C-alpha cells in the first residue's frame, strides 16, 4: 500500500500458501514436490503463470486429500525411486498405529505424458523417513515415536503383524 516511495508498505496478501512442512519436500524425477495447503504441488508450476490446476498434482483426490491434511498435525515424506513413488505420511503423537495414514503418489506414463495415480496407506506410523541406494539396492527407512528404525519394502509383515491390503480398480463400463 502507499502512493510514494516514502509511504509504501509491503504487506502479505495471505500466509496460507507455500510449503506446509519442510519434511515433505522431495525431488521426484526432474521436479520438486511438496505439501501445500491445497494438496501436493510441483515447484515447476510456480514458473508457469496461471497454471493453478496443473500445479496441484493431488487435485484428482481433493476431497480425500483435504481430509488427510485436516486429520494430521505432522507430515513427512520420502521418495521410492525404483517405483517412481512419492510417499506422504501423517503423524499425530500419541495416536494408535492403526489410525496413522499415508498417501502414495505413483508417477506413471500416460497417453498425455506423465500422470500421478494415488493410493492410501493405513497403519504405518512414520515420524521421519528417508531412502537411499547402496550398491544398486534401494533402502527405505523410517522411525516413529517408539525409538526404533524400520525398513519399508522388506518382508510380509509389519513388526510381526500381517499387512492388510485391498486392491480395487476403477469401475469399468
Where are these regions (language model features)?
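Beta-sheet repeat architectures centered on beta-propellers
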Residues: 16-22, 27-31, 37-173
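Surface-exposed extracellular loop regions of Gram-negative outer-membrane beta-barrel proteins
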Residues: 1-14
Amino acid at each position: 500500500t502507499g502512493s510514494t516511495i516514502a509511504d509504501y508498505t509491503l504487506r502479505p496478501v495471505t500466509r496460507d500458501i507455500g510449503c506446509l512442512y519442510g519434511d515433505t519436500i522431495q525431488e521426484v524425477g526432474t521436479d520438486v514436490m511438496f505439501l501445500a495447503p491445497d494438496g501436493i504441488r510441483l515447484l515447476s508450476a510456480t514458473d508457469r503463470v496461471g497454471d493453478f490446476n496443473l500445479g496441484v498434482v493431488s487435485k484428482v483426490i481433493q476431497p480425500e486429500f483435504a481430509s488427510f491434511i485436516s486429520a494430521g498435525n505432522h507430515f513427512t515424506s520420502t521418495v521410492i525411486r525404483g517405483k517412481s513413488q512419492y510417499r506422504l505420511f501423517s503423524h499425530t503423537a500419541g495416536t494408535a498405529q492403526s489410525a496413522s495414514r499415508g498417501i502414495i503418489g505413483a508417477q506413471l506414463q500416460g497417453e498425455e505424458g506423465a500422470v500421478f495415480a494415488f493410493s492410501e496407506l493405513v497403519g504405518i506410523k512414520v515420524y521421519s523417513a528417508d531412502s537411499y541406494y547402496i550398491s544398486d539396492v534401494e533402502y527405505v527407512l523410517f522411525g516413529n515415536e517408539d525409538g526404533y528404525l524400520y525398513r519399508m519394502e522388506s518382508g510380509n509383515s509389519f513388526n510381526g503383524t500381517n499387512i492388510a491390503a485391498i486392491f480395487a480398480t476403477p469401475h469399468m463400463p
